[in-house]
């Protein structure tokens, strides 16, 4: 089983890496250009992330209201998750961490996370050897997704909201403080280290879900493929699903934030690489406008290209 999973990871990395382009630069030129461009786009990564919220305040308001509604119903939905999902999805992916990393405490190199991190490392290493510029950009953007997701969730959002994690099971005192049965238990502060602190005040949003969706979005946009990145992300997420210990809204917010992070990274990278986003070009958008007047009563359909 362990050998099969390792072979599967190699095949996934190979499938993603297989999209090549004509070689125009030597290895060192390609490597240097990718690193320089990716470093220079860091400010724009966050500019694009900010635009995700500021470009359409009405939509942002709808999302905020929806999240508030999820928080209000968290006790019901989280209890249902604990009662019906966690007991019925019970598996653990085998450990694939190499022996020389046995002493590492980096959460992205151990456990289930390794199934996402190692293929990215393999993709980037293979792209370096093959002088594949696109593969190198994808690898760097994926590493950015991990770094940004970790910093935004652990340093910024969790420090701001400081929400405590739910008891497991809810309505008990099985774990005790800082786990809680109160879904409005916010602003509790943080203790010890900020990046990987103890459980107090670390519920909203889920760092793992944020990172999983950020990585999946980067790969989906770069390779125009939903099945491989989101399929792998789903398998990894449900491995040891009990261990996540989050309210439902924590995971939903993580998925939204992660998607925005991944999309912002790729759009910023595409702009620097001269790749135009033509995904909406040629699509017909229809707007339906009711019209009532003395001359006409009906539905006006306006098409935009």
What are these regions (language model features)?
Residues 76-90:
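Interfacial/capping segments of alpha-helical transmembrane domains
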Residues 28, 68-78:
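Alpha-helical transmembrane segments of multi-pass membrane proteins
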């Amino acid at each position: 089983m362990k050998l099969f999973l390792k072979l599967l990871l190699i095949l996934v990395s190979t499938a993603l890496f297989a999209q090549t382009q004509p070689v125009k630069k030597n290895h060192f030129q390609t490597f240097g250009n990718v690193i320089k461009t990716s470093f220079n786009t860091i400010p724009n990564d966050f500019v694009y992330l900010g635009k995700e919220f500021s470009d359409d305040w009405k939509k942002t308001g709808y999302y905020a209201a929806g999240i508030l509604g999820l928080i209000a119903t968290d006790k019901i939905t989280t209890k249902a998750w604990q009662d019906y999902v966690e007991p019925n999805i019970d598996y653990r992916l085998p450990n694939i961490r190499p022996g020389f990393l046995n002493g590492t405490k980096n959460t992205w190199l151990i456990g289930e996370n390794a199934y996402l991190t190692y293929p990215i490392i393999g993709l980037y290493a293979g792209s370096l050897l093959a002088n594949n510029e696109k593969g190198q950009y994808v690898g760097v953007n994926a590493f950015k997704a991990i770094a940004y997701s970790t910093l935004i969730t652990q340093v910024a959002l969790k420090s701001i909201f400081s929400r405590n994690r739910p008891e497991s099971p809810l309505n008990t005192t099985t774990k005790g403080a800082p786990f809680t049965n109160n879904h409005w238990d916010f602003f509790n502060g943080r203790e010890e280290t900020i990046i990987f602190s103890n459980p107090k005040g670390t519920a909203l949003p889920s760092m793992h879900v944020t990172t999983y969706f950020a990585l999946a979005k980067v790969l989906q946009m770069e390779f125009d493929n939903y099945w491989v990145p989101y399929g792998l992300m789903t398998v990894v997420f449900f491995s040891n699903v009990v261990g996540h210990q989050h309210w439902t809204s924590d995971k939903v917010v993580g998925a939204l934030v992660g998607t925005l992070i991944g999309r912002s990274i790729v759009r910023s990278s595409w702009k620097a690489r001269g790749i135009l986003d033509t995904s909406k070009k040629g699509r017909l958008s229809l707007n339906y406008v009711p019209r009532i007047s003395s001359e006409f009563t009906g539905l006006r359909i306006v098409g935009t290209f």
